[in-house]
């Protein structure tokens, strides 16, 4: 008695590779209220502070970024609202 083993390889099976995401704040980058290029990455078009889930920051980084965004707004480095739309 012979046993047949189906050795067909599924053509629909694909190997997927995940690309590593860059960290939102690089290790050498300094979070500061004067670093507007960094702070603007964590603000939406409506000038709202993005959530941790969207910005992929740690909770400590999120608190720091939020504090410095608020300081930059008070010192008039950043707008409170965006009236472009």
Swiss-Prot record:
- Which residue ranges does UniProt annotate as crossing the membrane? none
Q: Provide the GO biological process annotations.
A: translation
**Cellular component GO terms, alphabetically?**
chloroplast; mitochondrial small ribosomal subunit
Q: Which UniProt keywords apply?
A: Chloroplast, Plastid, Ribonucleoprotein, Ribosomal protein, RNA-binding, rRNA-binding
Task: Report the Gene3D superfamilies cross-referenced here.
Answer: Ribosomal protein S18
Coiled-coil boundaries: none
Recorded hits in InterPro entries, A to Z, give: Ribosomal_bS18, Ribosomal_bS18_sf
The keyword Ribosomal protein appears for this protein:
yes
Q: Where in the cell is it found?
A: Plastid, Chloroplast
Keyword RNA-binding among record annotations:
yes
The molecular function terms in GO held by this entry are: small ribosomal subunit rRNA binding; structural constituent of ribosome
Task: Read off the Pfam families from this record.
Answer: Ribosomal_S18
SUPFAM superfamilies hit by this protein: Ribosomal protein S18
Q: Which PANTHER family does the UniProt record give?
A: 30S RIBOSOMAL PROTEIN S18, SMALL RIBOSOMAL SUBUNIT PROTEIN BS18M
Q: What does the subunit comment say?
A: Part of the 30S ribosomal subunit.
- NCBIfam families named in the record: S18 (TIGR00165)
Give the UniProt family note.
Belongs to the bacterial ribosomal protein bS18 family.
Name of the protein described by the UniProt record: Small ribosomal subunit protein bS18c
Q: Say which species the protein is native to.
A: Zygnema circumcarinatum (Green alga)
Gene designation per UniProt: rps18
């Amino acid at each position: 008695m012979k046993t047949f083993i189906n050795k067909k390889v599924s053509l629909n099976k694909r190997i997927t590779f995940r690309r590593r995401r860059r960290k939102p704040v690089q290790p050498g980058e300094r979070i500061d209220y004067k670093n507007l290029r960094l702070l603007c990455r964590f603000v939406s078009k409506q000038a709202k502070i993005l959530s941790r889930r969207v910005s992929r920051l740690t909770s400590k980084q999120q608190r720091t970024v939020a504090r410095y965004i608020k300081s930059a707004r008070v010192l008039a480095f950043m707008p409170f609202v965006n009236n472009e739309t």
